[in-house]
A protein has these predicted regions:
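Structural signal for the N-terminal portions of transmembrane helices
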Residues: 14, 22-27, 76-77, 100-109, ...
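Juxtamembrane and boundary regions of transmembrane helices in multi-pass small-molecule transporters
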Residues: 2, 6, 115-130, 168-211, ...
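Membrane-interface segments at loop-to-transmembrane junctions
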Residues: 42-46, 69-73, 96-110, 133-139, ...
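Transmembrane helix-loop junctions at the membrane interface of multipass transporters and ion channels
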Residues: 64-68, 92-93, 125-127, 145-167, ...
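Structural signature of multi-pass alpha-helical membrane transport proteins
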Residues: 2-72, 80, 222-281
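C-terminal ends of transmembrane helices
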Residues: 29-42, 87-98, 122-123, 263-279, ...
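Alpha-helical membrane segments and immediately flanking helix-loop junctions
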Residues: 126-174, 335, 339-352
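Entry/N-cap segments of selected transmembrane alpha helices
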Residues: 93-119, 173, 283-284, 289, ...
Length: 352
């Protein structure tokens, strides 16, 4: 019986609970979250977000791991996630600016700016701490790398971890997913007057055009991945002094690896560097990364999550998150439809 308690609840030993305890907690949280992620509620699937919820549930019942290890695994998962994204988008990243991508990126910047303005307005009107409202914004727009970058910046400045940032993210994230989906439905019905069947047919045609091709090679090339991660961490740790900002700015463990992965995947072949990674290997790295990150965010936020939601300002945070989710999406949808004349599928891609 003591063995079972030690494995699940931890015991005095290496890394505050033992290696087996750590691996069991992380593995079960990810496994349960992934199983639940395959289910749909009212036709809506939360996917990998369930990993976050299961992590919160575990931490609420005291099934957690050492906080220093949580911090490490969270950052490592974030690096894997953003680096795999950079490898995927890098080859066509720069060419997209020459084929209408500049307009789409301009709309994306507009949407982000509106979200930031709404967030700043909420901060000053409600006196919510900056750390909390930053977490709410990250969850409301489902911006996982943004949360990681904000947490690292705060840690670099203060030397402390902001648990309320993770709690704000966890509270706002579910409604961020639902609000985004409902906003897309509203845009489809009101602005485009497209039926559900027509939109599904258009998406199917887009998939056929894109091909969703598999790579011919079965051997994943890990060399550029880990060299790029090392270079990205170095780049993200370089302090950059900007006028008007007292604290040097860093790209962090989200920005550095992302930039390096885009550059390596785009320009690596010119220098005879084999940067190709099979789609399956890239997807595996990305899914492991996001699963580790959300697991650790859940374990980090779960200890005070229920108390904040029930007895604290959790319901207000949900309302603020809904505003941050809906207002930028609807504003971007209006501009995209009536100013830029974008079709529905292109617009939803930008809004996502």
């Amino acid at each position: 019986m003591n063995l079972i308690n030690n494995l699940f609840e931890g015991a005095e030993g290496s890394w505050s609970g033992g290696i087996a305890h750590i691996l069991i907690i992380i593995s079960i949280v990810i496994a349960l979250g992934r199983i639940l992620g395959k289910t749909k509620i009212c036709g809506i699937s939360f996917g990998v977000t369930w990993v976050l919820f299961v992590g919160i549930l575990f931490a609420h019942h005291g099934l957690t791991i050492d906080h220093n290890l949580i911090h490490f695994l969270k950052e490592f998962g974030l690096v894997l996630f953003v680096y795999s994204i950079g490898l995927q988008v890098g080859p066509g990243f720069f060419s997209s600016f020459r084929s209408g991508g500049l307009v789409l990126n301009g709309l994306a910047v507009f949407i982000i700016a509106v979200g930031v303005l709404v967030t700043v307005g909420i901060h000053f009107l409600s006196d919510i701490p900056v750390t909390t409202v930053t977490g709410i914004m990250s969850g409301a727009v489902t911006n996982t790398p943004g949360l990681g970058a904000a947490q690292q910046t705060y840690f670099d400045i203060t030397g402390n971890t902001a648990n309320d940032m993770a709690q704000g993210y966890a509270v706002a994230y579910p409604l961020g997913v639902i609000g985004c989906i409902l906003s897309f439905i509203l845009i489809r019905i009101v602005l485009y007057r497209v039926s559900g069947a027509e939109s599904r047919s258009a998406v199917h045609n887009e998939r056929k055009t894109a091909g969703e091709l598999r790579g011919n090679s079965d051997q994943p090339n890990l060399i550029p991945i880990f060299i790029g991660i090392a270079l990205g961490c170095i780049l993200g740790s370089i302090p950059i002094s900007l006028p008007g900002i007292p604290q040097p700015v860093k790209l962090g463990l989200a920005g550095g690896p992302l930039i390096v992965s885009i550059l390596i995947s785009r320009f690596g072949p010119r220098f005879h560097i084999i940067t190709y990674t099979t789609p399956s290997a890239n997807l595996m790295i990305r899914e492991i990364g996001i699963s580790l990150f959300l697991t650790c965010v859940g374990l980090e936020a779960g200890e005070g999550f229920v108390d904040t939601l029930v007895h604290g300002d959790g319901m207000k945070w949900i309302m603020y998150g809904a505003l941050i989710t809906v207002i930028p999406v609807l504003a971007g949808g209006f501009i995209g439809k009536y100013v830029l004349r974008l079709d529905y599928n292109t617009l939803t891609g930008v809004l996502s």
